[in-house]
Amino acid sequence: MVLVEGAFCPAVVQSCLEHTKEYDRDQERRAERSAKGEALAMSRVSERCLRYANPTRCLSTKRTPMRFCIDRYEWPNRAGERPDFAMTWLEAEARCTSVGKRLCDVDEFTFACEGEEMRPYAYGFERDATRCNIDKPYVQPMRKATPHEACMKDASCKAELEGLDQRVSSGSMPCASPFGVMDMNGNVNEWVNRPGQREPWRSGLKGGWWGPARSRCRPTVTAHNEIYAGYEVGFRCCSSAKP
């Protein structure tokens, strides 16, 4: 595990200087439709920023001291192996507990990813698909999300999952955070714990995945409950640091 220690800023401003052309075109179309009074459905185009203003501004009057340990790699935390995927939050929590660890809290993941510099991406302020496993072509799944273990027992589910899979081996790309934690952006979306929430909504997803998603340090997806098992979903574990 990696020791993460420092001062975390709870509220920040990260100003995007340049978005993808796809996102800009989508926003223009939506603005035109809105001006005509047309109803707008949720956009299917992710807000991907190519370049952020440097430095990030901390809005909090006081930073929060943090000290904890986090796995260097996505579960099973072994360099050179592809991370597990199609996992539910409950499965992730149980596996971390089985090795004397726990799921990372939202702010722990964020700080381990961005560091005290509050980087939008683990590696800096400009999006770079050569650093992390991101921006691969999106492939539409044909069936409802199925947990990995159950999917492996169904030949058609297994075949589809293999066709969707675009993971890379842990540590195979130079996708390191300021603390040396690997693959915190992209590869697989990672389950985290949301303190103060009640089941089945203690679950959050952070870091993004291999597809055309935000794949940044700060955002947290809260739309999926604890039994969701998206094909792009994995996790890593945290633990309290010894005094």
Predicted features along the sequence, with ranges:
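Short, compositionally biased
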Residues: 1-97, 117-118, 124-127, 132-133, ...
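Short secondary-structure boundary/capping segments
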Residues: 59-61, 159, 227
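Conserved aromatic-histidine-acidic binding/catalytic patches
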Residues: 80, 84, 173, 225
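Functional-site microenvironments in short loops/helix caps that host divalent-cation chemistry
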Residues: 89-221
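Short proline/glycine-enriched turn/loop segments at secondary-structure junctions
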Residues: 223-229
